[in-house]
Amino acid sequence: MNILFITDLYPVKSDEKTTPRTLLAFVEEWKKMGHNVDILKPNFILNSFLRGKPFYKSGQYEDVFNINYWTPFWFDVKRKFNGNSRLGTLAQLNKHNYNIVVAHMPSGILFADKLGLPFVAGIHNSDIEVLTNPLYKIHFKPRLEKALRNAKAIACRSFVLRDKLLKLYPEFENKVFVAPSGIDKKAAMFLDAKQNEKHSADTNFSRFTSHISLSSDTNHSLLTTHHSPIKVLTCAHFKKRKNIDKVIKACKGLECFELTVIGDGKERKKLEKIDKNVIFTGRLPHDEVLAKMRNSDIFVLPSVGETFGMVYLEAMASGCITVCTKGDGIDGIIKDRENGFLTEPNFKSVKETLLNIKNLTKEELNSLYTNSFNTIQHYTSTLCAERYLQQILKIM
């Protein structure tokens, strides 16, 4: 199948560090399946500068064709295609005979709608922002609404986004599906590439929980680990909406917990002043983040405004009891007290959740880990890409 993938949320160069690679993972998996995928990155220049995104001149970069526009695609977007790119002129573009166009983020969706080719619209938190923020009411909201009506299908990046979109536009129900991301198999302890695939589920589960010990007294059975105090981890770029301060305040004064914070940003000095006992590591390479997760007991990040949240899946795969925000991000995959915990994004709720985890019985903790293990097996990058593609095939 020939797919044209359109989005500005895509690394132009393979060594680019600042752009999320979640959409890249879908493309890579589809290519492994034998499909041809061309990537078109339409870039609204002003938006690029306002958001501090990397800027590249228009042209072909490895497998990405980057096109810059001063205006947000008001005019004929096709006029900038040139014969030097892999996409070529408009005539050449049509000759590619793309079976489907997959477009993500507001700019990608608006651009795809301009092309006049059948497309799937991928909904992120940014799209919900355009549809609900009064600042976009006059111009962008009507254009995005029109594009969504024209889309053959709508792929929401999380269950939360699906529910938010359908609350706004219930008429889209028959063409909406959820397209979550999945973790790389190497990121999960039980899916390590070196692991013998013949191991049973029980063997895998024992490896998954190998760093956890359970009290044998179920009447007084608290969470006991090889770590004393209990190791709590959070990881994010220090933005206000990540609510790192709420985690620090929740742990402050709780002698049974030790908090480590991975990340950096403008808020760091303020955060460090809240509690001198918190361990700040700064930014770490991805493999070191995973190592920290595997050496922790609880991962908590009560952020808001998340499209999805790969870090939660990675924490679950690393054997952490994982806490996310209720009604945001990965809620719907994480189910409260079943395979993780949901919390309100305030320090009192986070503190209460941590104490609830500490007081889990042996049976409750065992059930939690079993369910978490079973959940994560369904969210690898390969499986998620396959399910996304299956949904696309349904509309063709």
What are these regions (language model features)?
Residues 1-53:
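N-terminal subdomain of nucleotide-sugar transferases
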Residues 160, 182:
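Carbohydrate-associated surface elements
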Residues 4, 155, 200-202, 226-242, ...:
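Conserved donor-binding/catalytic core segment of Leloir-type glycosyltransferases
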Residues 304:
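Aromatic "clamp/platform" in nucleotide-sugar-dependent glycosyltransferases that forms part
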Residues 321-324:
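Short hydrophobic beta-strand element within catalytic cores of glycosyltransferases
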Residues 18, 84-85, 118-120, 128-146, ...:
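Nucleotide-sugar donor phosphate/pyrophosphate-binding loop at the beta->alpha transition
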